[in-house]
Regions:
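Axial heme c-ligation environment in periplasmic c-type cytochrome domains
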Residues: 51-58, 79-134
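N-terminal hydrophobic targeting signals that begin at the initiator methionine
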Residues: 1-2, 26
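Bacterial N-terminal signal peptides that target proteins for export
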Residues: 2-14
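C-terminal motif of bacterial Sec signal peptides marking the signal peptidase cleavage site
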Residues: 21-24
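Residue-level signal for mature regions of secreted extracellular proteins and peptides
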Residues: 18, 32-35, 127
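Sequence/structural segment immediately N-terminal to covalent heme-attachment motifs in c-type
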Residues: 26-50, 66-76
Length: 135
């Protein structure tokens, strides 16, 4: 019986790094609390938007081909016309310049995983690069 216990430890120790890697992956899946706190009141809990007032996120090019523009829109806000899906809307979105890079990464990861075209997350380094290139 003691031999069985001794044989279990190498197996447990061998699996431990894989379990640690898997638990780390969960952290990069995005945090709905940032979205719920800053975005859901206008864009809706399910990203559906609000009729002609606020655009839906479910069919947004900013979560696909134009993902590099999203950090600038979030940090600077939007005033005026914006193309969303098949429509052009005249909107006012407040700036969220106070979000940290970590919060921005969490928010964009959450958006990508829920409504993005590829369902991929982006790195904090990439977000920082995009923010440096904002107009």
């Amino acid at each position: 019986m003691n031999a069985d216990r001794l044989l279990r430890w190498p197996v447990i120790l061998a699996l431990l790094p894989a379990l640690m890697l898997l638990s780390g992956c969960k952290e990069n899946r995005g945090d709905p609390s940032v979205y719920n706190r800053h975005c859901a009141s206008c864009h809706g809990r399910e990203g559906q938007g609000l009729k002609a007032l606020y655009p839906a996120l479910t069919d947004s090019a900013y979560l696909g081909d134009r993902i590099g523009e999203l950090p600038c829109l979030i940090s600077s806000g939007v005033r005026g016309k914006i193309v969303t899906g098949k429509r052009t809307k005249n909107i006012r979105m407040p700036a969220f310049a106070d979000l940290s890079i970590q919060q921005m990464n969490s928010l964009i990861s959450y958006l990508q995983l829920n409504w993005g075209k590829g369902g991929e997350t982006v790195s904090e380094q990439k977000i920082s690069q995009w923010l440096r290139n904002c107009p």
